[in-house]
């Protein structure tokens, strides 16, 4: 069918080359772990400064993810996907900043819709059937979801207890990233999820109790964010793009931002958004 065959194209050649690389997501490059810890540290500092600085840091991380996410997942049109993700990151940041104080989620759904519409406009075929259309849409929209999830924690950054609650979740992510290194041992491998959960729970309890929260809150939040973030790296790290530096950085950033919606949900249940 016309427009479907992409043999010999630079993108096809790149996929064939990457396809020969064996990827084991239990033994991700050290760059990923280091980038996770740096991302956690940046967000932990920003959330203490308030919702404005926090939104700015997430926007910068969104730009970094815009560059590496299409490389990680081998988007059929990486340049177009990067542009859409950059536009989406800017829209999400603007939506959070223009919303009334304490209501930074008011325009977030609209900004997500803007990003999704941009993804459709960029991917919809123009006269021919574009190969891997669904792949391209899925890759772009998961990137949008990652940035939106990170931005969703911005309402919690507007109060001292809310920012402390985010800190508990981020501490769980960091603890899980360190415990994940046990997966490099052949006898551990995929079983690293258990030390990840334990580390997230222990560190979560410690940070929660020092921040004025209950042990059960620290246990649940730390364990959930650690295991969620670890699962993101296990799933999205099992692709050939994880062998590229851009893909590794995007994987790290995405695995820290994606649990954000979970932190928001638990924070809402704890009455921190009232």
Regions found by a protein language model. Give the residues of each.
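N-terminal signal-anchor module of multipass membrane proteins
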Residues: 1-63, 70
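C-terminal transmembrane helix-loop-helix hairpin of multi-pass membrane proteins
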Residues: 3, 7, 185-274
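C-terminal ends of transmembrane helices
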Residues: 16-19, 63-76, 118-132, 174-189, ...
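Central hydrophobic cores of alpha-helical transmembrane segments in multi-pass inner-membrane proteins
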Residues: 39-40, 58-68, 88-93, 114-120
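Alpha-helical membrane-inserting segments
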Residues: 43-46, 91, 95, 99, ...
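Structural signature of hydrophobic alpha-helical transmembrane segments
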Residues: 45-61, 101-117, 154-173, 214-227
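Cytoplasmic-side transmembrane-helix entry/capping segments in multi-pass membrane proteins
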Residues: 76-87, 107-111, 131-142, 187-199, ...
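Internal active-site segments that recognize and position negatively charged phosphoryl groups
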Residues: 127-209
């Amino acid at each position: 069918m016309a427009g479907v065959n992409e043999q010999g194209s630079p993108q096809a050649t790149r996929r064939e080359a990457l396809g020969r690389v064996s990827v084991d997501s239990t033994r991700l490059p050290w760059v990923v772990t280091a980038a996770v810890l740096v991302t956690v540290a940046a967000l932990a500092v920003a959330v203490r400064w308030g919702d404005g600085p926090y939104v700015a840091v997430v926007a910068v991380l969104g730009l970094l993810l815009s560059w590496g996410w299409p490389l990680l997942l081998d988007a059929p049109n990486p340049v177009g996907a990067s542009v859409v993700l950059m536009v989406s990151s800017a829209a999400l940041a603007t939506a959070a900043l223009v919303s009334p104080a304490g209501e930074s989620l008011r325009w977030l759904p609209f900004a997500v819709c803007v990003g999704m519409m941009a993804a459709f406009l960029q991917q919809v075929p123009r006269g021919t059937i574009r190969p891997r259309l669904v792949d391209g849409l899925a890759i772009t929209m998961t990137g949008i979801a990652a940035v939106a999830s990170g931005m969703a924690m911005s309402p919690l950054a507007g109060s001292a207890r809310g920012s402390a609650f985010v800190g508990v979740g981020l501490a769980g992510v960091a603890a899980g990233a360190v415990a994940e290194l046990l997966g490099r041992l052949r006898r551990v491998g995929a079983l690293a999820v258990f030390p990840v959960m334990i580390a997230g729970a222990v560190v979560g309890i410690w940070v929660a109790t020092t921040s004025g929260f209950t042990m059960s809150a620290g246990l649940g939040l730390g364990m959930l964010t650690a295991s969620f973030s670890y699962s993101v790296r296990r799933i999205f790290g099992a692709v050939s793009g994880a062998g590229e530096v851009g893909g590794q950085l995007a994987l790290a950033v995405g695995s820290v931002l994606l649990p954000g919606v979970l932190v928001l949900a638990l924070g809402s249940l704890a009455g921190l958004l009232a």
